[in-house]
Swiss-Prot record:
Example of a GO biological process term: translation
Gene encoding the protein: rpmF
TM helices/strands, residue ranges: none
Protein name: Large ribosomal subunit protein bL32
SUPFAM superfamilies, A to Z: Zn-binding ribosomal proteins
Keywords per UniProt: Ribonucleoprotein, Ribosomal protein
Family: Belongs to the bacterial ribosomal protein bL32 family.
InterPro entries the record matches: Ribosomal_bL32, Ribosomal_zn-bd
Magnesium recorded as keyword: no
Amino acid sequence: MAVPKRRMSRANTRMRRSQWKADNVALQDVKIDGQTVRIPRRLVKAAQLGLVDVEQF
């Protein structure tokens, strides 16, 4: 684990943290029960197996 050489000020810490931004999830078009829905790629298999309710999306 990385260990800092010196203490980082509260202002610098908060400035660094504020630069972090989450990315939008890429959606895929999937046809389930004759209905086309856009869901995240990681949920495609579960949606096809019926484990996820696609009405939420």
